[in-house]
Amino acid sequence: MNWLTNVVRPKIRNILKRETPENLWIKCPDTGQLVFYKDVESNQFVIPGSNYHMRMSADARLRSIFDNETWYDVALPEVTADPLKFRDERKYVDRIKDARTKTGLHDSVKVGFGKLEGAGVVVAVQDFDFMGGSLGMAAGEAIVRGLELAVEKQCPFIVFAASGGARMQEGVLSLMQLPRTTVAVQMLREAGQPYIVVLTNPTTGGVTASYAMLGDVQIAEPGALIGFAGARVIEQTIREKLPNGFQRAEYLRDHGMVDMVVHRHDLRPTLARLCRLLTKAPEIDAAPEPSPAAEEPAEPMPAPEAAAPSAPPA
């Protein structure tokens, strides 16, 4: 028995560990139930049953919005990686390197240009997995460049906000991005193009004092935490108990801070409809079916790769 217990059984455990992916199961933060990862992924990262909206990566978000899951990555300007030579427990440059390795992103905001139900649109996505989606110089440049591109292309701009606020490691250079992005939003307005904001979980801090609350239409995902300061800080400041659901998407909708709360499965058609209404563009009809007299239908073309060239066409 000692040989079976001490040698064979540990080897079997090691084999099973190697064959089992670490993210095979996901625990729902709302109900605590374990759900198969692939079921959540195929459901746009919404937990089946509880409808809890998990965070989405920037690439997954862009795939869920653009036609045929295809878009052009917008080339973004380079900025100084560590302007203040900041260090706390670790060097800021090391934190940036780790975040880039973890997410595959250059910074917390990714911008894409593509088609949404046949119409051109620029979409910016904040990825919370990159240092909490914090707003620094690179993220601010990405938002501004996306808005400039929307003006150039004369098309709507959609931003998916998910952030813990300004990036403290960049100090006042991070805070400067609040007025810069606000001015860029005004530039888009003067060009007569729609600016649509989708608030996801969580959207807090400095971004709520700038571009995240300036949309022509404010949309929120169900249950998203949205606010400037945390609920505990507010309670300690005003010395009063806050109401249930305070700073959640549904509470903000009921009190006029957002226009609508939209389930993730309904976001794409909702955004397409809003873009058509705000640009007064006609609805694009589906391609007509071939006549019965046609000999053979054309061969279907496979969908292109998700990530296309690095810059949109002129």
Curated annotation (Swiss-Prot):
It comes from the Bacteria. InterPro entries: AcCoA_carboxyl_beta (IPR034733), Acetyl_CoA_COase_Trfase_b_su (IPR000438), ClpP/crotonase-like_dom_sf (IPR029045), COA_CT_N (IPR011762). It is found in: Cytoplasm. It catalyses: N(6)-carboxybiotinyl-L-lysyl-[protein] + acetyl-CoA = N(6)-biotinyl-L-lysyl-[protein] + malonyl-CoA. Residues 24-293 form the CoA carboxyltransferase N-terminal domain. Pathway: Lipid metabolism; malonyl-CoA biosynthesis; malonyl-CoA from acetyl-CoA: step 1/1. Keywords: ATP-binding, Cytoplasm, Fatty acid biosynthesis, Fatty acid metabolism, Lipid biosynthesis, Lipid metabolism, Nucleotide-binding, Transferase. GO terms for molecular function: acetyl-CoA carboxylase activity; ATP binding; carboxyl- or carbamoyltransferase activity. Residues 283-314 are annotated as: Disordered. Its EC number is 2.1.3.15. Residues 284-295, 304-314 have a biased composition (Low complexity). GO terms for cellular component: acetate CoA-transferase complex. One of its GO terms (biological process) is fatty acid biosynthetic process. Acetyl-CoA carboxylase is a heterohexamer composed of biotin carboxyl carrier protein (AccB), biotin carboxylase (AccC) and two subunits each of ACCase subunit alpha (AccA) and ACCase subunit beta (AccD). HAMAP family: AcetylCoA_CT_beta. Component of the acetyl coenzyme A carboxylase (ACC) complex. Biotin carboxylase (BC) catalyzes the carboxylation of biotin on its carrier protein (BCCP) and then the CO(2) group is transferred by the transcarboxylase to acetyl-CoA to form malonyl-CoA. Belongs to the AccD/PCCB family. This is Acetyl-coenzyme A carboxylase carboxyl transferase subunit beta.
